[in-house]
Swiss-Prot record:
<dbReference type="GO" id="GO:0015935">
    <property type="term" value="C:small ribosomal subunit"/>
</dbReference>
<dbReference type="InterPro" id="IPR001209">
    <property type="entry name" value="Ribosomal_uS14"/>
</dbReference>
<dbReference type="GO" id="GO:0008270">
    <property type="term" value="F:zinc ion binding"/>
</dbReference>
<keyword id="KW-0687">Ribonucleoprotein</keyword>
<feature type="binding site">
    <location>
        <position position="43"/>
    </location>
    <ligand>
        <name>Zn(2+)</name>
    </ligand>
</feature>
<keyword id="KW-0689">Ribosomal protein</keyword>
<comment type="subunit">
    <text>Part of the 30S ribosomal subunit. Contacts proteins S3 and S10.</text>
</comment>
<keyword id="KW-0699">rRNA-binding</keyword>
<feature type="binding site">
    <location>
        <position position="27"/>
    </location>
    <ligand>
        <name>Zn(2+)</name>
    </ligand>
</feature>
<dbReference type="InterPro" id="IPR018271">
    <property type="entry name" value="Ribosomal_uS14_CS"/>
</dbReference>
<feature type="binding site">
    <location>
        <position position="24"/>
    </location>
    <ligand>
        <name>Zn(2+)</name>
    </ligand>
</feature>
<dbReference type="GO" id="GO:0019843">
    <property type="term" value="F:rRNA binding"/>
</dbReference>
<feature type="binding site">
    <location>
        <position position="40"/>
    </location>
    <ligand>
        <name>Zn(2+)</name>
    </ligand>
</feature>
<dbReference type="Pfam" id="PF00253">
    <property type="entry name" value="Ribosomal_S14"/>
</dbReference>
<dbReference type="InterPro" id="IPR023053">
    <property type="entry name" value="Ribosomal_uS14_bact"/>
</dbReference>
<keyword id="KW-0479">Metal-binding</keyword>
<keyword id="KW-0862">Zinc</keyword>
């Protein structure tokens, strides 16, 4: 889990738009966040395996 102070700091409006970054809405992780789902890769994988993300299936070819 992310530090509470870092999550609070990120939620405030930044002075410059360049400083804004995505953060996982579930755990607060700042890296490897899928914008479409607003989830990090770890949370995305957990929820996808449980079938809680509609339209997402495990690939097989």
């Amino acid at each position: 889990m992310a530090k509470t102070s870092m999550v609070a700091k990120q939620q405030k409006k930044q002075k410059f738009a360049v400083r804004e970054y995505t953060r996982c809405e579930r755990c607060g992780r700042p890296h490897s966040v899928y914008r479409k789902f607003k989830l990090c890769r770890i949370c995305f994988r957990e929820l996808a395996y449980k079938g809680q993300i509609p339209g997402v299936r495990k690939a097989s070819w």
